Curated annotation (Swiss-Prot):
GO biological process: nucleotide metabolic process
Domain of life: Bacteria
Name by which UniProt lists this protein: 7-methyl-GTP pyrophosphatase
This protein's record includes keyword Cytoplasm: yes
EC identifiers of the protein: 3.6.1.-
GO molecular function, one term: nucleoside triphosphate diphosphatase activity
Gene3D superfamilies, A to Z: 3.90.950.10
Site (Important for substrate specificity): F13, Q77, E162
Subcellular location: Cytoplasm
Function recorded in the entry: Nucleoside triphosphate pyrophosphatase that hydrolyzes 7-methyl-GTP (m(7)GTP). May have a dual role in cell division arrest and in preventing the incorporation of modified nucleotides into cellular nucleic acids.
Record's GO cellular component terms: cytoplasm
NCBIfam families: PRK02478.1
Keyword annotations: Cytoplasm, Hydrolase, Nucleotide metabolism
Length: 199
């Protein structure tokens, strides 16, 4: 039987958010080269929220091709500081560089969701959050990264707000779910509107 609702992601955090909301779904990660999709957009000067939306759409369309009758949720998150777009750090040294760049500044998270069925886009949404990181010393960055280890490599910005990363911040504006990479309230509203979940 074809699943009714599919999350096109391997992210344990996105799966957890959907499970905690009581949604019945399957998770099937997209098989796309994200950097190959993203590179021409960045070269053309696309805004970070546009990049997030295009990546979310590419993921959903890829999975929809395998499960055409299912409603597929594609999602992606980009992070920017001024004109600089951040990606997941490659290693701990790169994570330290991210934290140095973000220290004492306000950056933006852009979390996109796209719903696709039978290859057709039914809905797109991009949520935004502004996060102000407190000034961090070199010693603190080193101690923090020694505690969190490779978990720092699993998200843009080298932090996880749902864990010890919350200690890095002095101010946050925006929806918590958007920060975690899946704006749940707009998503749940659209799923109710489509009759996918009980409303």
């Amino acid at each position: 039987m074809t699943p009714k609702l599919i999350l096109a992601s391997s992210s344990p955090f996105r799966r957890m958010l959907m499970e905690n909301a009581g949604l019945f779904f399957e998770a099937h990660p997209a098989e796309i080269d994200e950097r190959a999709v993203e590179a021409p957009l960045e070269k053309a000067g696309a805004k970070p929220d546009t990049v997030a939306c295009v990546l979310a759409k590419a993921k959903a369309e890829d999975v929809s091709a395998r499960f055409p009758e299912s409603l597929v949720i594609g999602s992606d998150q980009t992070m920017s500081l001024g004109d600089r777009v951040f990606h997941k750090p490659k290693d701990i040294a790169d994570a330290a560089n991210h934290l140095r760049a973000l220290s004492g500044t306000t950056h933006r998270l852009n979390s996109a969701i796209v719903l696709v069925r039978d290859g057709a886009v039914l809905w797109e949404h991009v949520g935004h959050a502004e996060l102000t990181m407190r000034p961090l010393t070199e010693d603190f960055i080193a101690r923090h990264l020694s505690r969190v280890g490779e978990r720092a490599l699993s998200s843009v910005g080298a932090y996880q707000l749902e864990g010890e990363g919350v200690q890095l911040f002095e101010k946050i504006e925006g929806d918590y779910f958007t920060i975690l990479g899946l704006p749940m309230l707009p998503l749940l509203g659209k799923l109710r509107e489509l009759g996918t979940i009980d409303g």
